[in-house]
Amino acid sequence: MSVFDRSVALHHTGDDTEILETILRMFVQQGPERMGLVEAALAHRDAKSLEREAHGLKGAAATLGMEDLRQASYAVERLGADGRLDEAAAGVAAMRVAMDAAVAALGRELA
């Protein structure tokens, strides 16, 4: 598993370190906000929003080499798509752990 793989993220930016730094800073700011939308969707028992928000984070995580977050997001996306909200709470909690770890790793990367 991987909290953050710089080589994957760099590959997706065409090896442009300036673009990578900009994207990482955006993720540090916007990722937790997007995670809040996932948690709100679960709290409101809105399966469609849960699926959509988890899907968005899955894509960002894949692009930035955050495999732990990608896998957790994918699992929640599938649960939302299937309307299995009672099972989604544990998945959303796993997403939160992965998000917090990713943001911490990016903070170290950007320091």
Task: Identify the role of each PLM range.
Residues 1-111:
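Two-component system phosphorelay core
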